[in-house]
């Protein structure tokens, strides 16, 4: 697995096997840094500075992100196809050998998924972005893979979707939970999981949620089914499908609806709003009354803030058509 430059290297043995702490792993996430705007913490920004829009060019793409110091979420990593980039100290660096990197809320930790097996196991790199240290944690054994990492809101755990190859496609068979403090991973098989399921955290970090045959299912961390909401459409929304308050969650509306995006009540699954927006992707929530969506704009695309009627209120990023075709993905997290 590629290294992250500058980390101390230590090795320790646990009950679950050997966890290798590699200073070089966390430093690979900081190598080849390209200049970009440095972000000031919103809490310390003067009122005038907080309103200034800063344009940030994303390394290796034609994407321009438009940020303000007081924004509630910011782009902390992104991928272009299977190439991942991480933001450190306001700069983005290409991370060779990793297909995705996701930063935890508050920015202390990141989890990176490599592009290849190591010793017949899939794994993740847990990076402590404050201490500049990293630890390799095995997730599943070949032929399974674990990808699509999502952090719990407290930054204590990451969940990944576990898949098995079936012909030319990959079928979901369960999920893996990575404990950031213990530096361990536990894989859980989910009986009857939807083949296209992608597991995300519920807002409390005690259950995971995924789509199931056009609806939504919630599972305990033991893989047991807790509840099902039929006919909601599949959960969607970048790193977190749930609103900041945890009251609502986003789904792609069923095909029988005119509107593409639905807002559902977390407790009941009932419809809270239909959002009439031509979303090509949903990147999460801005606040409880606004979401982030990628929409067509001329011959290109834009990431926008939109209210729950579908009205765009701000442009967050300009995305060329070539980058969208190359599957660029912007990861917005809460600092």
Predicted regions mapped to residue ranges:
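Secretory targeting and sorting signals
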Residues: 1-48
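Sequence signature of WD/YWTD-type beta-propeller architectures
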Residues: 2-7, 45-335
């Amino acid at each position: 697995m590629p290294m992250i430059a500058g980390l101390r290297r230590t090795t320790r043995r646990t009950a679950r096997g050997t966890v290798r702490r590699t200073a070089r792993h966390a430093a690979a996430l900081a190598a080849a840094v390209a200049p970009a705007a440095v972000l000031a913490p919103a809490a310390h920004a003067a009122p005038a500075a907080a309103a200034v829009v800063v344009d940030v060019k994303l390394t290796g793409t034609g994407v321009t992100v438009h940020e303000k110091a007081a924004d509630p979420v910011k782009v902390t990593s992104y991928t272009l196809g299977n190439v991942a980039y991480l933001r450190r100290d306001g700069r983005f660096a290409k991370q060779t050998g990793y297909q995705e990197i996701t930063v935890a809320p508050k920015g202390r930790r990141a989890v990176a998924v490599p592009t290849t097996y190591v010793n017949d196991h899939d794994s993740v790199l847990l990076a402590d972005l404050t201490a500049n240290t990293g630890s390799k944690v095995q997730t599943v054994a070949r032929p399974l893979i674990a990808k699509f990492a999502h952090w719990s809101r407290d930054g204590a755990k990451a969940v990944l979707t576990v898949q098995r190859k079936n012909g030319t496609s990959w079928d979901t068979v369960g999920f893996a939970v990575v404990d950031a403090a213990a530096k361990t991973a536990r894989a859980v098989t989910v009986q009857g999981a939807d083949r296209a399921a992608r597991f995300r955290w519920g807002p409390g970090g005690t259950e995971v949620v995924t789509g199931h045959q056009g609806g939504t299912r919630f599972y305990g961390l033991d893989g047991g089914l807790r509840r099902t909401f039929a006919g909601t459409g599949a959960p969607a929304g970048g790193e977190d499908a749930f609103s900041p308050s945890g009251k609502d969650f986003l789904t792609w509306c069923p095909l029988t609806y005119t509107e593409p995006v639905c807002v559902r009540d977390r407790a009941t699954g009932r419809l809270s709003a239909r959002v009439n927006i031509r979303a090509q992707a949903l990147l999460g929530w801005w606040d409880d009354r606004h979401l982030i969506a990628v929409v067509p704009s001329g011959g290109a695309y834009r990431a926008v803030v939109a209210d729950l009627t579908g009205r765009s209120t701000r442009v967050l990023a300009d995305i060329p058509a070539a980058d969208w075709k190359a599957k660029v993905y912007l990861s917005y997290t809460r600092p």
